[in-house]
Swiss-Prot record:
HAMAP family: AddA
GO cellular component, one term: cytosol
Stated name of the protein: ATP-dependent helicase/nuclease subunit A
Catalytic activity as recorded in UniProt: Couples ATP hydrolysis with the unwinding of duplex DNA by translocating in the 3'-5' direction; ATP + H2O = ADP + phosphate + H(+)
Organism: Pediococcus pentosaceus (strain ATCC 25745 / CCUG 21536 / LMG 10740 / 183-1w)
One of the record's GO molecular function terms: ATP binding
Entry's transmembrane regions: none
Amino acid sequence: MADREYTLSQKQAINSSGHNILVSASAGSGKTSVLVERVIQKIINGEDVDRLLVVTFTEAAASEMKERIRAAIVKKINEVSDIELQNHFSMQLNKLNNANISTLHAFCMSIIRNYYYIIDLDPTFRIMDPTESELLKESVWADLREELYERDEDGKFALLTRNFSSDRSDEGLQDLILELFEFSNANPDPQAWLQQIAKNYEVPSDNVMDMEFIQQLLTEVKTKLMRIYRKDLDLTEQAINGGEPLKNAAEKFQNEVDDLKTIIDSLNGSWDDVQQAVSKMKFAQLPRGKKEEVQEFNAYAKSIRNDFKDEFNTIADKYFKLSSEQMIAVFKDAHDLMMKLIEVQNQFAERFLQEKLTRRSLDFSDLEHFALQIVLDDSEEGQAIRRDFQQKFNEVIVDEYQDINPLQETILTSVASPDPGNMFMVGDVKQSIYAFRMADPSLFISKNNQFKDEEQADERIILAENFRSMRNVDDFTNLIFNQVMDTEVGEIEYDDDAQLQFGAKYYPDEVQNNTEVMIYDDSQTDINDKEATPIISNKNDGQLQMIAQRIQKLFADHTQIYDKKEQKMRDLEYSDIALLHSTGSNNLEIVDTFKKYGIPIQVNNAQDYFQTTEVSIMMALLKIIDNPYQDIPLAAVLRSPMVGLKENELAFLRIGKKNGHYFEALLYFLNEAKLDSNNEFQMQLKTKITHFLEQLDHFSKLARQSTLVDLLWAIYDETGYLDYVGGMPDGPQRQNNLHALYDRAKGYEESSFKGLFQFVRFVEKMRDKNKDLAENPVVTDVKAVKLMTIHGSKGLEFPIVFLIDAEHGFNTMDEKGRYVLDRDAGMGITLKDFIHRLEIDTVQKNWIISIKKQKALAEKLRVLYVALTRAEQKLIITGAVNSADDTLNKWAEAVDTDETLIPAEARSKVSNFLDWIGMAIMRVPSVVEKYADYNTRKLQGTLIPDVELKIINSSELMDQQGLTALKSAQIPELQQLNAFDDIADVDKFKQIMNFKYHDEAATTTTAYQSVSEIKRVFDDPDKFELNFSEVDADQHIKPQNRFVTESLMAPRFMNEATKPKAAEIGTATHLILQQLDLNQPINETIIKDKIGELVMNRVLDEQVANRIRISTILDFFDSDLGQLMINHPENVHREEAFSLLLPAKGLFPKVKGDDDVLIHGIIDAYFEMEDRVILLDYKTDFVLPGSVEQGIEKVINRYQGQVNLYAQALGSILKRPVNEKYLYLLSIGRLVEIQ
């Protein structure tokens, strides 16, 4: 280590001492090396390693640091000849094992183990597994909740529950209690923090202006109003200077400015003064007229005025709707609710702690709180312990300081020397990305601002040189953050101290890699033939194929990278590439796409753990072992390799017994069905079912008699499933996933919780929370592209990094709940008025949402910084947009300024990484020249890197697909010819290429068809029988890959950030019709409540929900059929799935064999009356208002065959004919009968 050449700033960080030191270490700046060298230098200078406290973020980091220190000490022993020094180093080597180089939790554990008697704690405690802790919390809360209901004499607990829960469940309050517990526990004094959040609702002297939070709010409002005022004043002055054509507008704008000034002045008066002034504010219209001066002014002023009008209206709506009297009434009710909440929260915390102590168990949070209690104990003995720590540790070294919370900070400062300080804190606030773990970057920011003052004793050291990345990565990162990060949007200035400095001078000068921004443009995808299976199904698919093709091109171009270990250039390998994204929600799609392109890929994070085939099948089997009367898990197991039933076999079993649970159909097939012993199909099916039921019975008995882990291992062993998945693609990973499930079951049983049912329930809860049960990483030397989240990549580096899905929207769910929590601002709630059936968002809630938005945006900027700085040599950013032209126009408008920093309004409205990056690169000279039509101004500066902005559309990808398919054709005969003959045998080539399969039509037809696909093959739907009219099988759509997954992905209309499409609104309307309760009157209020419930439960996107035409739904229920549905709900069946087995050659005449096709569909609704059966299907097709009758005729022609097929299926299920068939056209609210 001594051989390494350190920079001046690194030497300063290694050698400076005698006071508190904060080291701000940018990405790639050699932070760990500096930390280790600092410890080594202290040892060299005679200090004992056990007199240092070194706190790391992870156990792996602590182990690595110990090993590096050990290696350095051993090296010193071998280097020095002085016997005294050798003895000193040898002693340090012995002391290293017991040195306090560990995680904070491990340090807290050592405090408690040594001084447990100070707080009267049983020393025989164990540390709970996080899984056990989660389960115990829920168990404790369930018991406490029942008690609170029973002794709720004043009804306050019921009111609290109703306020934070839905009509159907009281889990809303449970979620709040558990989240509030986590928030409060991240503070040194949870009780004090809880009392403070209630204080925000206290009104001193019945004057809201005396409330501390109101004064903070008004300060923030004044800043925003002053910004609006200045913009309006600027436009007013321009209108005045515009002469006679703008005279009237100038006068109106001047009145606006005066009114704004009045509002700003009123902020020093009473609340009612402000509220009345705000309510009177009216904005004038832009001037009208065709004169050039008017047109030019309007073109300039329109977007500016719209922006500040929107901002003003937001302020007015969120803060100034209520008078002071109304506000006080709301605050009083809210305060009463908060006090009850805090009372319940304290009871839960106490009960949870007592339960843990009874079990002699602690969790990680307890370790921190108990350690703090010991070091802050006011008894004489407690004070002596604190002094001992302060005297023992000559220095307290904290790694990743940006990620600690106030509780952890208090522990560390309590054991450090108070004066002079001896804390050495290292981190990079630009990489603080763990708010969900209660990390508080403000602690770092505060010291960063304080320590840079040279007049005070403490010191700040900047490590800015990046020794990881090539210059192009540094320059691009600086390019982006110079334009988007400051204290207003980002919480810190991206100044000279924050910028990356190029330090990796070992890269060869000839290696040049420009950063690429690749955008898939979905606006041209509609050119695909609507009646054919699209090569690119949607914009996400387009982006993934674009990424795969770019990777293929890297290899086709024989790309080379610089190998730092070998210190030479070499060919690119797949393992040199990493794909980073915000979430793992589309991991499965990415893996599927890469497999199609033959690109090996390894998933390093586990967002989709529960959706992996092997885990979902195992969970399905465990469910039916516990209770076989569950149709979906049972079907999954029967279809899986464990049983291996085919679709036609599944259908045959159901046909035998159409009603009841599917398990009953299995029993009926074995015990009651009349089987033909000469029928090979039936006999083979009987063998499979018999074996399966025997095995299921065996496993059920084992579940009752043995442990969960024994059951799991027996399943793995006796079914051979563990070995089977090892032979699948990514076999080692799949086996590790099953081992992880086994380990989790073992951990579960080692806790106090037992039983298969509880374990299945626990796993489902973890799945719903996207929590725990992560895949075990497979450490292999497989050369594969790495796929991981940005959070998972922190601390890692890769030669080539793709930041993908950059258009993925930020999560804003905090704003939509019934409460919002913030460490600093407290808690904001929605108050329910049950008398008037109103929900009131308190001013506190709206204020805290605003604060959290700012914090969330700052963290998203930091996440982006982490992503960009993982790249060593090349950075490629990808995204997908609905229209590239619209997107580029939006970016160009946002950066219409000569300032380097993009206006805060534009930066704060961003909802994804791509918009920040896009706005920043629109002024890069190379982009300005290439996309000159957008008239953006060039960014001025000397260190502006070239950026390649590429817009890719579907036609370009399709062209490339053809080339890719040709290059990767895997025809063995052709490969042999190509390998051994310089000139291929043309005749043999033709023979191979012209080969015709005897039943070629069957190769283009799947054994499973949905009705929506099969409807395309009807020529004469009115004459539907088992034999269809003649259809050319060649015209049938080629099947896409089919798979079954219990996907938790939201529907498409939950994911689009753009204006909802008509089809999405229709689909949402369809959903409302499906879910409305027919046992209550259907009116506008009921429908709105249902829509609100679906939005709250994240089933519907709010943007789509707002576009649902409630009148369309009411019109349906006003119709005769709608009234029939309301009057006879017991006769109505909705969303009924069916399967129908039909001969394939009847559907596709060119199919020559006797194969069958399983038709599957879902009937929207049917009425089973005494005298008739009525079939109803909702359709979302758009019908032009100007040609309604023609449009209806087209819809009838389009769906007549499908509806007739539904009718045949329904008739066969009910054993009676369908008498009436209807379509309800949602776009026009018309009921149409099908003859």
